[in-house]
């Protein structure tokens, strides 16, 4: 079993490297870096009592910086994508906390809460924030995809049509982002529903009424995750578009040569004298 699973992982990496080339190798490297940050940075700090939400945002920033740097290098496009991604994730985190307080979801209404309470007795981990940390990590992939796509689109437009100004590039980025909002929102919703599918099936089997179902902690948590993640994706679009339009869309004014520049800066240029009906130079 373990040998077959290991071979499967090797084949997956080979396929990514063959199809993606250098980009595929860099994607695997960034994924490995994110895993190392989660296991060796986020988890130990959580056990020492550091806020899970705060340390998760730090890990998200580090992962975003390395991933987008490997894929796009140090450029205005990368800076725009990083700003848009981090802003979207922060918005998703803030929205999750606000929605959680409004709906009375404290973070203790999660699976394995009994085990977590036992672990918390011997550690300083703040288990009430783990739910919101999971929302932040789940929203990272979608916001990063949107931020990089918007920045790449604006850069391509600027290279193809340098005459476009900041406003035109921003509007074009917003138009492209509108098409991505719906698909990315569906991606987040489907991911959350897929992760809690067994629990949803159990609730359906008990034939609960609509009021009981919609007011349950499970459904409330799913709605909170979907709304906060979607809000983060939606706000990533204008932020990334605005930053990219400002950084990438700066026009370089080319000075047109004047007549005096053509004639070595002489202001007393005179037409050559001619004589005769055929205009021969004297």
Regions found by a protein language model. Name each.
Residues 10, 193, 199-282:
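Hydrophobic alpha-helical transmembrane segments of membrane transport and translocation systems
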Residues 28, 151-167, 250-265:
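Cytoplasmic juxtamembrane regions at transmembrane-helix boundaries
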Residues 85-219, 223, 227-228:
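Generic detector of multi-pass transmembrane helix bundles and their immediately adjacent loops
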Residues 4-5, 49-50, 64, 106, ...:
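Mature, Sec-exported extracytoplasmic domains of Gram-positive
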Residues 13-118, 128-135:
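Transmembrane alpha-helical segments that form the functional core of multipass membrane systems
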Residues 1-11:
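Single conserved hydrophobic/aromatic residue that forms the stacking wall/gate
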Residues 26-27, 77, 97, 148-156, ...:
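Short helix-terminus and kink motifs of transmembrane alpha helices
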């Amino acid at each position: 079993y373990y040998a077959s699973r290991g071979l499967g992982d090797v084949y997956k990496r080979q396929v990514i490297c063959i199809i993606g080339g250098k980009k595929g190798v860099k994607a695997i490297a960034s994924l490995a870096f994110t895993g190392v940050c989660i296991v060796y940075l986020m988890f130990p700090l959580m056990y020492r009592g550091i806020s899970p939400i705060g340390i998760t945002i730090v890990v998200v920033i580090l992962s975003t910086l390395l991933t987008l740097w490997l894929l796009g290098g140090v450029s205005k496009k990368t800076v725009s994508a990083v700003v848009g991604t981090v802003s979207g994730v922060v918005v998703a985190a803030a929205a999750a906390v606000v929605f959680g307080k409004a709906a009375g979801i404290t973070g203790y209404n999660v699976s394995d809460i009994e085990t977590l309470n036992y672990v918390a007795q011997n550690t300083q981990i703040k288990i009430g924030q783990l739910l919101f940390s999971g929302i932040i990590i789940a929203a990272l992939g979608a916001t990063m995809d949107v931020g990089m796509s918007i920045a790449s689109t604006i850069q391509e437009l600027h290279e193809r049509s340098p005459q476009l100004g900041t406003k035109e590039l921003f509007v074009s980025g917003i138009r492209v982002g509108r098409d991505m909002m719906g698909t990315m929102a569906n991606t987040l919703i489907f991911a959350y529903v897929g992760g809690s599918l067994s629990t949803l099936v159990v609730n359906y089997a008990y034939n609960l009424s609509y009021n009981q179902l919609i007011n349950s902690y499970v459904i409330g948590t799913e709605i909170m995750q979907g709304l906060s993640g979607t809000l983060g994706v939606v706000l990533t679009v204008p932020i990334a578009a605005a930053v990219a339009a400002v950084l990438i869309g700066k026009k370089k004014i080319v000075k047109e040569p004047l007549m005096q520049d053509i004639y070595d800066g002489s202001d007393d240029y005179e037409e050559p004298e001619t004589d005769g009906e055929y205009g021969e130079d004297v």
